[in-house]
Amino acid sequence: IMNKNIEDCSDKMRNHVLYIPHENCLKENLTIIENLRIWLNLIDKKISNYNLNDKLKYFDLYDFKDFPIRNLSHGQKRKVILSKLLLSDSSIWILDEPMNGLDIDSIKKLSRLIENFSESGGAILLSSHVNYKIKKANKIHLKKRKINTIRTQKFITWSEL
């Protein structure tokens, strides 16, 4: 991160990177709020209940905030994990299959969120088996673990990738 080995980085520096895995990494017996509060504590981020509730509205989760995760659909669980994007101050997002399980409206919201983050100077590495229409994206298609094609509006150097 920022020209330093990840093992030599401070927690503060590691917080510049937010990783959203493809699997559900939520505690099933806890509520949406409880799961997000645990994560916020891990990254040492303070946020008011009002602000947290407001962020949950983006992905239409506010009405379910006190539901245990086990009672949510796959798509709702995915949106809980993706809500971390709204709560994080990270400058780099690594997203693994972020749109899997999402409905069309949620995909559009996530696409807007990604585009706004990129336009504000954030960097995103997104892996997907589906070709989503995200504007202003550099796309590298891999086949058998090798670069097959590169589609970009403006190609940057390999070291910048």
Where are the regions a protein language model picked out?
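ABC ATPase NBD Q-loop/coupling interface
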Residues: 1-12
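Q-loop/switch helix immediately C-terminal to the Walker
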Residues: 23, 28-44
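Conserved ABC ATPase "signature" region
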Residues: 37, 49-64
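Conserved ABC ATPase signature
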Residues: 68-77
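Hydrophobic anchor residue at the start of the ABC signature
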Residues: 82, 121
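Catalytic Walker B motif of ABC-type/P-loop ATPase nucleotide-binding domains
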Residues: 93-97, 102
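Helix N-cap at the start of a conserved alpha-helix in ABC-type nucleotide-binding domains
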Residues: 104-106
